Amino acid sequence: MRFWWVNHKQTHLQEIEGGYIWSPKNNRNGSRNQTYINLTKTTPGDIVYSYADGHIKAIGVVERHCSGMPKPAEFGRTGDYWSNDGWLVYLNWKKLQNPFRPKNHLDILGPLLPEKYSPLQKNGNGNQGCYLASIDSELHDALIEITEASGNTIFLKDSEENRLREEEVEESKISELSIQETEKVQLIKSRRG
């Protein structure tokens, strides 16, 4: 599982409501943009943080692999200068009850930001040239702590990691039952389908 941070001030309303993120495949001048290419590196179960208007507003779980897709019609005139040829990744977004400003937590987050393709500038403002940034597990852990400390309940049960963890807990409970080993194996097999 990988972790990502999307800067999408212009399109976050459409993308959160629509359950996706979208970017053009290239910059306006035709050059490659690593933060657009990053959409192709996402896999189901990956976690994505939504950043817009200076706040982390939602957390999403990637549902499907990236696919080539024209610019969504619901963008309207937003991004008129973007190419119509783009990448789309479907996500299951969960809006935060209490969005928070990463800039207010720069003492914690600053040292954890990636050196290259950082989603934030050193002053804590969003990096306008960065769309989808890869972040490491340390930054993810810090974001989760801040999200929870801000009064949010986090449900990422859609992720593969959480599904596997839940299965392990259930299998552990079955293993502790005082029944024959063959019955335990059958129960575990029936849970897996």
What is each stretch, according to the model?
Residues 56-67:
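Short beta-strand-centered aromatic/proline hotspots
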Residues 34-38:
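A structural connector/turn signal
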Residues 39-43:
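Short, well-ordered loop/turn sites that connect or cap secondary structure elements
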Residues 1-12, 26-33, 71-190:
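Contiguous surface segments at macromolecular interaction interfaces
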Residues 18-21:
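Intrinsically disordered, low-complexity regulatory segments
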